[in-house]
Regions:
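Class I SAM-dependent transferase core
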Residues: 1-69, 73, 103-106, 110-118
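Conserved SAM/SAH cofactor-binding pocket of Class I
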Residues: 60-141
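Short beta->alpha connector loops
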Residues: 144-145
Length: 145
């Protein structure tokens, strides 16, 4: 996969490059972030304008490092970044979103239901990472204190 940079090509080109077959789903997710994500305080009110560059495209570099068929935990998933982006860009990767707060889990479940397809595998677990009784090949955490 060619390594395209957000500042050198159009948003549509990047979406087509990194989300083949998932274009509608990633756009639906971006809409969720800008709408319900801001309303529920999962992302800041000024983040809507930069949702693609600062949040979605920022999650893409790791997708090129994951081997085919890997499993991944996204700890403290919050609004689903980077876990949902990884799942949509790499449908072969099984992604588990781990989040302790109920309101965030509700948001994640709504997003997963809205973007789900037979091509992607995303599981949402309410809990703390140390309490999860499963394992994964890789772990991500973004803005976790």
């Amino acid at each position: 996969m060619e390594n395209l940079q957000p500042e050198s090509v159009s948003r549509e080109t990047l979406i087509a490059q990194y989300f083949p077959g998932q274009i509608e789903a990633i756009q639906r997710y971006a809409d969720f972030l800008v709408g319900a994500g801001i309303e529920r305080g999962l992302i800041g009110p000024r983040e809507g304008e930069r949702i693609w560059d600062r949040h979605i495209f920022n999650c893409l570099p790791i997708t090129q490092l994951l081997p085919e068929g890997a499993s991944l935990f996204d700890i403290g998933s919050g609004a689903g970044l980077p876990g949902i982006v990884i799942a949509l860009a790499r449908p072969d990767v099984k992604v588990t979103l781990i989040e302790p707060l109920e309101r965030r889990v509700e948001f994640l479940n709504e997003v997963v239901a809205a973007i789900s397809s037979d091509l992607i595998e995303i599981e949402v677990i309410r809990g703390r990472a140390q309490d999860v009784k499963k394992s994964a090949n890789f772990i991500t955490a973004r803005a976790v204190a």
